[in-house]
């Protein structure tokens, strides 16, 4: 899906890691949420409350998923899921464009 229709967009950015990771929240009519964001090169760790699906829209990232011992590469057009109440780490070598879907 390259566009979303009939949604509410929160104008204020979600800003992490001194502005190196930013996103905007999109709320759908059924109450589900997604964020659309950009990550600049660096290494980041995030905690999850809800389960998430991270879809790569551009660029690439190395991901260390919860319980994993090896890093996995994800590129444009690929996605991965992160369980609720967990933590995952990212290594970004080039600008990464992403869509994060929060699962209920």
Curated annotation (Swiss-Prot):
Catalyzed reaction equations: a purine D-ribonucleoside + phosphate = a purine nucleobase + alpha-D-ribose 1-phosphate; adenosine + phosphate = alpha-D-ribose 1-phosphate + adenine; cytidine + phosphate = cytosine + alpha-D-ribose 1-phosphate; guanosine + phosphate = alpha-D-ribose 1-phosphate + guanine
SUPFAM superfamilies: RmlC-like cupins
Documented EC number(s): 2.4.2.1, 2.4.2.2
Keywords linked to the UniProt accession: Glycosyltransferase, Transferase
Coiled-coil ranges per UniProt: none
EC category name: transferase
InterPro entries, A to Z: Ppnp, RmlC-like_jellyroll, RmlC_Cupin_sf
Cellular component aspect of the GO annotation: cytosol
GO MF term list: guanosine phosphorylase activity; purine-nucleoside phosphorylase activity; thymidine phosphorylase activity; uridine phosphorylase activity
Plastid in keyword set: no
Pfam families in the cross-refs: Ppnp (PF06865)
General function of this protein: Catalyzes the phosphorolysis of diverse nucleosides, yielding D-ribose 1-phosphate and the respective free bases. Can use uridine, adenosine, guanosine, cytidine, thymidine, inosine and xanthosine as substrates. Also catalyzes the reverse reactions.
Similarity section: Belongs to the nucleoside phosphorylase PpnP family.
Protein name: Pyrimidine/purine nucleoside phosphorylase
Gene label: ppnP
